[in-house]
């Protein structure tokens, strides 16, 4: 699957997510980390390597930055970092987020 197809798939999943579920995930940073951890584990079970997991996390970060308002201080910080980062830095930030939830 190429990056554009992956982007469309992730955006479709986020758009299809019921509003209250998405709100619950985004209102609390611990909930967000739990959601991200589930997605990372799901990807690993499907055989995705770390590079693919990071690219997926970066696509999710792009989606959230464009379509969702931060609902807590941690999300505000992530959005501000995302807004000033170039593509390479966004990938590094996504890598750190994957590493963060993978160690929990």
Swiss-Prot record:
Organism of this sequence: Bacillus subtilis (strain 168)
Top-level taxon of the source organism: Bacteria
Gene that this polypeptide is encoded by: yflH
Segments traversing the membrane: none
UniProt protein name: Uncharacterized protein YflH
Coiled-coil region: none
């Amino acid at each position: 699957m190429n990056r554009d197809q992956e982007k469309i798939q992730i955006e479709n999943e986020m758009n299809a997510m019921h509003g209250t579920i998405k709100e619950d995930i985004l209102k609390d940073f611990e909930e967000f980390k739990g959601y991200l951890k589930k997605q990372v584990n799901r990807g690993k079970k499907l055989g995705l390597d770390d590079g693919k997991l990071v690219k997926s996390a970066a696509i999710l970060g792009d989606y959230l930055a464009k379509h969702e308002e931060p609902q807590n201080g941690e999300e505000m910080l992530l959005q501000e970092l995302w807004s000033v980062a170039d593509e390479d830095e966004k990938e590094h930030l996504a890598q750190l987020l994957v590493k963060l939830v993978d160690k929990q």
